[in-house]
């Protein structure tokens, strides 16, 4: 089968073959699956074992450098790159949305550049570099049980009609906390006081982004407080790294964290947006759209949005 120029040795893997590998625990552990679709598409649904590949205009420019530099941009996890370098993985599989073969990949797109970088860096080693034929769209058709679906939106946008809503309850308190990522939830102070709701979500830790909301269940959950007010004078960015480290610590321990403020609209939403920007290297507008799809009432104040834009610049231009 013809292969795109520069990718002559890339093998093409069928969806059924990948599904069989992922169903074998030993083979699944030795398979690195790299999803080159946009971040929002990945979060809506993805192969459970896959890792998202960051991509934006700046990374596009940097990925055109040396293969090692391209791989560092597209696979920023140093520990994972080290595992590849030591030959600990049997295969690295790259996928996009629906390309039928390597020959269809745009030369300046993330899948093509990542395949080329992997081939160069893995040459002569035990790791096979593969492209998934038909991409995620085909794999989801063949192996839906191996794919993860995004949770349904739990809270409608402000002003939206909802026949099940209680007019006595503020819209920001209706429903329950919303899942942003499998280990990251966003909600209000009222949600943080609902023990049954927290347990139903599997929450193990709470990040309280307020100076006034109490920590209701100190003996049951791991709490961290960021005592800031929701006003234009607050430098919430001073807390970004501390908050991100806390969320990552909960993630790494296998737990789930609820981030909340009084209404779950401005302060806690800002922290969740900062986490997405830094951890997933996405633009603010992408992160904002993603979170708003899940919690329609979010609206960080003007100053907080400016601080998030500064973070975006620092992260994406680093």
Curated annotation (Swiss-Prot):
Give the protein name, as stated in the record: Dual specificity protein phosphatase 2
Q: Result of mutating residue 294 to K? A: Loss of phosphatase activity
Q: Give the multimer and partner information.
A: Interacts with MAPK14; this interaction does not lead to catalytic activation of DUSP2 and dephosphrylation of MAPK14.
Native species: Mus musculus (Mouse)
PANTHER family reported in the protein's UniProt record: DUAL SPECIFICITY PROTEIN PHOSPHATASE, DUAL SPECIFICITY PROTEIN PHOSPHATASE 2
Which keywords describe this protein according to UniProt?
Hydrolase, Nucleus, Protein phosphatase
Kindly state one GO CC term assigned in the UniProt record: nucleoplasm
Q: Which Gene3D superfamilies does the record cross-reference, listed alphabetically?
A: Protein tyrosine phosphatase superfamily, Rhodanese-like domain
Residue ranges annotated for the Rhodanese domain, each copy included? 27-148
Q: Which GO terms describe its molecular function?
A: MAP kinase tyrosine/serine/threonine phosphatase activity; mitogen-activated protein kinase binding; phosphoprotein phosphatase activity; protein serine/threonine phosphatase activity; protein tyrosine phosphatase activity
Reactions performed catalytically: O-phospho-L-tyrosyl-[protein] + H2O = L-tyrosyl-[protein] + phosphate; O-phospho-L-threonyl-[protein] + H2O = L-threonyl-[protein] + phosphate
What does changing residue 292 to A do?
Does not affect phosphatase activity. Loss of phosphatase activity. Does not affect interaction with MAPK1
């Amino acid at each position: 089968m013809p292969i795109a120029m520069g990718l002559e040795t890339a093998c093409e893997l069928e969806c059924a073959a990948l599904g069989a590998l992922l169903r074998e625990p030993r083979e699944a552990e030795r398979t690195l699956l790299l999803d080159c679709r946009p971040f929002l598409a990945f979060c809506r649904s993805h192969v459970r074992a896959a890792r998202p590949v960051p991509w934006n205009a700046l990374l596009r420019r940097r990925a055109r450098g040396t293969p090692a530099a391209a791989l560092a941009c597209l696979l920023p996890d140093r520990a994972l790159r080290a595992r590849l370098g030591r030959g600990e993985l049997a295969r690295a599989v790259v996928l996009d949305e629906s390309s039928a073969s390597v020959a269809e990949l745009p030369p300046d797109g993330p899948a093509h550049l990542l395949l080329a970088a992997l081939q160069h860096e893995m040459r002569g080693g035990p790791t096979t570099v593969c492209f998934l034929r038909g991409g995620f769209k085909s794999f989801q058709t063949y192996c839906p049980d191996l794919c993860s679906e995004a949770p349904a939106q739990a809270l409608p946008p402000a002003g939206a009609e909802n026949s099940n809503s209680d007019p006595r309850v503020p819209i920001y308190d209706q429903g329950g906390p919303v899942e942003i990522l499998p280990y990251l939830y966003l909600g209000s102070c009222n949600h943080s006081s609902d023990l049954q709701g927290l347990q139903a979500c599997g929450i193990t830790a709470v990040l309280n982004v307020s100076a006034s909301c109490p920590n209701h269940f100190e003996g049951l959950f791991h709490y961290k407080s960021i005592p800031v007010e929701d006003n234009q004078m607050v430098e919430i960015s001073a807390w970004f790294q501390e908050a991100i480290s806390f969320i990552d610590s909960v993630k790494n321990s296998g737990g789930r964290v609820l981030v909340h403020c009084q209404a779950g609209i401005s302060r806690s939403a800002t922290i969740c947006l900062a986490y997405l920007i830094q951890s997933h290297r996405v633009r603010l507008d992408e992160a904002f759209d993603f979170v708003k799809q899940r919690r329609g009432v979010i609206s960080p104040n003007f100053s907080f949005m400016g601080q998030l834009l500064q973070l975006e610049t620092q992260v994406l231009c680093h």
